[in-house]
């Protein structure tokens, strides 16, 4: 039986770099909110223990794809703890709408959806806490997608506090470039000492993103996208880019600006939601 699972985008409504650990990882404070927009995973259970990705990504070996890695990780851990029914496997395909290197969390969201969906379909019975712990081994952003609620994140992004920011409408624009996260985090001019603040203080301040100055400097397309969008509404970078976004109180206001978007921008309008569309499906 084929099943369909949302794999939503996220926005970093703010992102501040508060330090760098001895292992090279950066500590941060960020606010995650989901979008009612994203990829869709199609999963059909198999009964021969095989994992097949039917929609390979150009330039990425299947076994390196986060979708396959997440499936194999769940299979391994559930098997070792005696919670994997014999023969559990899956055929997985993806309808991809989220750009790679866009700062929307596409790969992390895909991995989280696989963990949540296969845990359900295989009836492994792992808790959300267990799935989030597995997810963290795949990427720092995976746990927030596994938990499925908007959150204030600290540490390297793994310390999550559920929050309920206003659910605005957003115009999200991709300027046609892919930004690998290390390009931003390795830049010597990246701000790395923004003072840590409480969530209550941060929610009262104007939101910004410490990575934005580097992304604008190194990628003229990002600079051009923000320059255009700022003419209409407060706008900023999400994650390490390349996507930028502006917030609006109504869908109609966002769509009016979308109609003005230049042809070189790939833009869409979506609602910010505090409960992930993936978890809404499970209710």
Swiss-Prot record:
Pathway involvement of the protein, from the record: Isoprenoid biosynthesis; isopentenyl diphosphate biosynthesis via DXP pathway; isopentenyl diphosphate from 1-deoxy-D-xylulose 5-phosphate: step 3/6
For molecular function, the Gene Ontology terms on record are: 4-(cytidine 5'-diphospho)-2-C-methyl-D-erythritol kinase activity; ATP binding
Q: Name one GO biological process term.
A: terpenoid biosynthetic process
Keyword ATP-binding part of the UniProt annotation: yes
The family database entries (Pfam families) matched by this protein are listed as: GHMP_kinases_C, GHMP_kinases_N
Where on this chain does ATP bind? Answer: 99-109
- EC code(s) of this entry: 2.7.1.148
On whether Oxidoreductase is a keyword of this UniProt record, the answer is no
Record-annotated active site: 10, 141
Q: What family is this protein classified in?
A: Belongs to the GHMP kinase family. IspE subfamily.
**So what does this one do?**
Catalyzes the phosphorylation of the position 2 hydroxy group of 4-diphosphocytidyl-2C-methyl-D-erythritol.
Q: What is this protein called?
A: 4-diphosphocytidyl-2-C-methyl-D-erythritol kinase
Q: What species is this protein from?
A: Salmonella typhimurium (strain LT2 / SGSC1412 / ATCC 700720)
């Amino acid at each position: 039986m084929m099943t369909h699972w949302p794999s939503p985008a996220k926005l970093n409504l703010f992102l501040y770099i508060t330090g760098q650990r001895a292992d090279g990882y950066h500590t941060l404070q960020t606010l995650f909110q989901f979008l009612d927009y994203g990829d869709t995973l199609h999963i059909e259970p198999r009964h021969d223990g095989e994992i097949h990705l039917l929609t390979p990504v150009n330039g990425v070996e299947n076994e390196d794809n986060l979708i396959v890695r997440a499936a194999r990780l769940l299979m391994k851990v559930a098997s070792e703890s005696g919670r994997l029914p014999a023969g559990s496997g899956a055929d997985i395909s993806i309808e991809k709408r989220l750009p790679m290197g866009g700062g929307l969390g596409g790969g992390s969201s895909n991995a989280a959806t696989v963990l949540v969906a296969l845990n359900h379909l295989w009836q492994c019975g792992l808790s959300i806490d267990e799935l989030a712990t597995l997810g963290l081994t795949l990427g720092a952003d995976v746990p927030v997608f596994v938990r499925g609620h908007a959150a204030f994140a600290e540490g390297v992004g793994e310390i999550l506090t559920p929050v309920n920011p206003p659910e605005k409408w957003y115009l999200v624009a991709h300027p046609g470039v892919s930004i690998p996260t290390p390009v931003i985090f390795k830049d010597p001019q990246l701000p790395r000492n923004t003072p840590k603040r409480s969530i209550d203080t941060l929610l009262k301040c104007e939101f910004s993103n410490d990575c934005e100055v580097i992304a604008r400097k190194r990628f003229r397309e990002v600079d051009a996208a923000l320059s255009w969008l700022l003419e209409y509404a407060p706008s900023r970078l999400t994650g390490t880019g390349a996507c930028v976004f502006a917030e609006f109180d109504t869908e109609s206001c966002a769509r009016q600006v979308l109609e003005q978007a230049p042809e070189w921008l790939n833009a869409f309008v979506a609602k910010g939601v505090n409960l992930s569309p993936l978890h809404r499906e499970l209710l």
